[in-house]
Swiss-Prot record:
The keyword Cytoplasm applies. This is Acetyl-coenzyme A carboxylase carboxyl transferase subunit alpha. PROSITE patterns: COA_CT_CTER. GO terms for molecular function: acetyl-CoA carboxylase activity; ATP binding; carboxyl- or carbamoyltransferase activity. Acetyl-CoA carboxylase is a heterohexamer composed of biotin carboxyl carrier protein (AccB), biotin carboxylase (AccC) and two subunits each of ACCase subunit alpha (AccA) and ACCase subunit beta (AccD).
Amino acid sequence: MADPIRSYLDFEKPVAELDSKIDELRALAANGSDISEEISRIEDKAKAALHELYANLTPWQKTQVARHPQRPHCIDYIAGLITEFTPLAGDRKFSDDDAMIGGFGRFRGESVCIIGQEKGSTTESRLKHNFGMARPEGYRKAVRLMDMADRFGIRILSLVDTAGAYPGIGAEERGQAEAIARSTEACLNLTVPNVAVILGEGGSGGAIAIATANRVMMLEHAVYSVISPEGAASILWRDATKAQEAATNLKVTAQDLARFGIIDTVLKEPPGGAHRDPADMIARTGDAIAQAFSDLAPLDPKTVRTQRRQKFLDIGRRLG
């Protein structure tokens, strides 16, 4: 992924000021000034400030981090983890959907089916991928690929990053709710192991449709919820400005969801979030995925499906 000019969130202002000071000093050093000790001192101060800040993020701040425009996306993880990736297109019923990436490749030498939502990173790509909000044909494409992988005994990896399924009129006319339900059903019926990773946002049924997996992992600063904080605030308080309060009450964070048993693993992010060191985050995620598939490898197909179904039934009974 390209190294764009760093974008700071509102709450990162203290770190932004220190980084700006470091850049100024480096410019002076380039002109021959010997200020290496001062630069080192401020760099240490910036690292400490960043560590303290990210160790105490509120749920709303984590939501902002999960949406960071420079956070690595689905295609970045595919590029970093998958070899011989061959994308497949179309749902064989209506059209293709660029919001839902799908195909086959190799993960650490073994065949894998990859399904994931792509938000895009530029204006052009965001429009192309519809900001990661899949339409019915995207979920039907996912079902087609899951069925294909299941027939050939190929493991499935889901990379989740969406604000939710697309709520447009056309999507509703083409059966958005049914498509999401069928995709969730397809996940539950798989006899091959599937692993899901919440990379950034896990928005409602749009995320669950490909995240109903044997193992569900979340990045440390990702969020996963039935509704966005802004949406919940608008419904509960008729005031979208109460999003911060809504985020706290929704329990959207990986830490909350791990405590409730909804997800299995929290993947630690580099200091300052995944967007500050995408390569490191992608490598960490790859190691966790490999471990999850290794743990599931000894299970026979019937047990793989039974354990997955029982897992989600238990969540419903425990929290319902």
